[in-house]
Design a protein with these regions (language model features):
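Glycine-rich, often proline-containing surface loops adjacent to acidic residues and nearby aromatics
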Residues: 83-86, 120-127, 175-196, 240-242
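Compact, glycine/acidic-enriched structural inserts
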Residues: 111-159
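C-terminal, helix-dominated tail/subdomain
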Residues: 230-273
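Gly/Pro-rich turn-and-neighbor structural signature
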Residues: 1-76, 190-225, 230-240
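TerminUS-proximal long segments
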Residues: 257, 261-303
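Extended, acidic-biased charged interface segments
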Residues: 138-227, 231
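Internal mixed beta-strand/loop scaffold within catalytic domains of large alpha/beta enzymes
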Residues: 44-121
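Short conserved micro-motifs at the rims of enzyme active sites and ligand-binding pockets
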Residues: 71-73, 193, 252-258, 276
Length: 303
């Protein structure tokens, strides 16, 4: 399973970076191959200062070896070996009319002293963070997510959409980071799904990513915008940074376990603002976005 999934994310990384380069038309992804001394490594690809994408990363990694002490405590296990691989991406567009997107698909195994698998699971998801709310874009993104889920279980979309809204929530601001999507974790073999079926589901979601996101980018990338709208984008990006550094389990975990800092922090945007006690004007497009972030909508149901 681990080789099957790693081969899949290698191919998916190629597909996604090629597609985004074609949309941008100016910038290319730079590749950084790195090695983890305890075992494994990764292939980081970063795009910067493009015509469409200001900064973004599409990274894959495959790490293995003894489970670090912090992870032993987290999983409540003793000294065991592990394997983990995944693809993680964050794309920050230049235009405030184009939403930021995040996605992650991952697989984890734990072994006993004889090397037999004692636990294994998939996790992942994809979510959208707009700066200006185009309802048709929100409906499209969620409809694609729902379509991918429905092929495997009619309850998945509702469950994983709810988890996404709950997870990507800035509790200190009382608002969501974005308009959600899917979030799932600890997808283990059970009475209704074996690991091959979970693999089929997770790869279905991965394969849906470009359909969910790129048509939105194409539709919005040439819209005009003002300096004030760009300021709003940078203020909202500040909320993105707050979530990633204050609440995100993956970021905090990486920082606590001596993870690769460049890969961990690649999710942060290049230009951000924090304006003291900032509030959008009443009745403005900016306020409309905030209302939705505070009160999540069932986008797929209204599509």
């Amino acid at each position: 399973m681990k080789n099957q999934f790693y081969n899949y994310i290698e191919g998916l990384q190629d597909q996604i970076t090629s597609s985004l380069e074609a949309i941008d038309g100016l910038a290319k992804f730079e590749e950084d191959l790195w090695v983890r001394k305890e075992g494994g490594g990764g292939r980081t690809r970063i795009i910067q200062n493009g015509a469409v994408f200001e900064k973004g990363g599409v990274n894959i990694s495959k790490v293995h070896g003894p489970l670090p002490p912090a992870m032993q405590a987290y999983f409540n296990v003793g000294e065991v070996d592990f394997f983990a691989c995944g693809l993680s991406l964050v794309i920050h567009p230049k235009s405030p009319m184009v939403p930021t997107v995040h996605a992650n698909w991952r697989y984890f195994e734990m072994y006993d002293k004889e090397g037999a698998i004692v636990d294994q699971w998939f996790g992942g998801g994809q979510d959208l963070t707009p700066y200006y709310l185009f309802e048709e874009d929100a409906k499209h993104f969620h409809s694609v997510c729902k379509s991918a889920c429905d092929k495997h279980d009619k309850n998945f979309y509702e469950d994983y959409k709810k988890r996404c809204d709950e997870y990507f929530y800035n509790s200190h601001r009382n608002e969501g980071r974005g308009i959600g999507g899917l979030f799932f974790d600890y997808c283990k073999a059970n009475d209704t799904m074996d690991m091959e079926q979970w693999y089929a589901f997770v790869t279905e979601v991965g394969d849906s990513f470009l359909e969910a996101y790129t048509s939105i980018v194409e539709k919005r990338k040439n819209l005009t915008y003002t300096e004030a709208q760009r300021d709003w984008q940078e203020i909202r990006r500040g909320r993105y940074v707050e979530f990633n550094l204050v609440h995100d389990k993956g970021t905090l975990f990486g920082l606590k376990t001596n993870g690769r800092i460049e890969s961990i922090l690649m999710s942060l945007p290049a230009h951000v603002q924090w304006v003291y006690d900032h509030h959008p004007e009443k009745g403005s497009e900016e306020e409309k976005l905030i209302e939705v972030l505070k009160n999540p909508i069932e986008w797929a149901a209204s599509a």
